Amino acid sequence: MPKVDLYNMKGEVVGDIQLSDNVFGTDVNKDALHAVVVNQLANRRQGTQSTKTKSEVRGGGKKPWRQKGTGRARQGSIRSAQWVKGGIVLGPKPRSYRYTLPKKVKRIAMKSALTSKVSGNEIFVLDALALDAIKTKSMVGVLNNLKVDSSALLVIDSKNENIVKSARNIPGIKTAYVNTLNVFDILKYDKFIITKDAVEKVEEVYA
């Protein structure tokens, strides 16, 4: 079982914590990670792109010249695709890019992402995280104590307005709950900061 240091809010090591092999010590499956990240990005797409077809562009209702006898190529409308200001053939229309992946693939990817943070020494486990008030300076102090000078994902076990609002104005810092944790965010942010209580919930869900 992987063992990592347990920190307090002052950045001091106050012990260690054993992490579940089934969640934080699995093999990293890059194929599953790729599949889930692509899926998440596809599901975020609005799909509102739209082009006008020949029947939708303005004008072009009259045949520009008679069919035969002019010496020119036959034309039915000045809004056919080959004309300037003509309609688009087979252009994009509003659509949904959303698709689902098997739950098993998602679980494998989540475990792989968490394992990659442990194996890369990019995880900080806090014994507790509590702020008396909404104060960005206090959260910056915690991050400085942990010597986190890059982007970080902060995971807490339950809703806490003081923590969320204290962290939201810090560039490169994002707060997540256990039930909103996702593979893309874990991989996107350099450091993974999680409370001890959140670790227990993650292991309960994914073990």
Curated annotation (Swiss-Prot):
UniProt keyword annotation of Glycoprotein present: no
Protein keywords: Ribonucleoprotein, Ribosomal protein, RNA-binding, rRNA-binding
GO molecular function: rRNA binding; structural constituent of ribosome
Biased composition range(s): Basic residues: 60-71
Organism domain of life: Bacteria
Location of the region described as Disordered in the Swiss-Prot/TrEMBL record: 44-76
Family matches, as Gene3D superfamilies: 3.40.1370.10
GO cellular component, one term: ribosome
SUPFAM superfamilies in the cross-refs: Ribosomal protein L4
Keyword match Iron: no
GO biological process: translation
Subunit structure: Part of the 50S ribosomal subunit.
Matches recorded under PANTHER family: 50S RIBOSOMAL PROTEIN L4 (PTHR10746), LARGE RIBOSOMAL SUBUNIT PROTEIN UL4M (PTHR10746:SF6)
Record's function text: One of the primary rRNA binding proteins, this protein initially binds near the 5'-end of the 23S rRNA. It is important during the early stages of 50S assembly. It makes multiple contacts with different domains of the 23S rRNA in the assembled 50S subunit and ribosome. Forms part of the polypeptide exit tunnel.
Recorded family membership: Belongs to the universal ribosomal protein uL4 family.
Designated name of the protein: Large ribosomal subunit protein uL4
Gene (UniProt): rplD
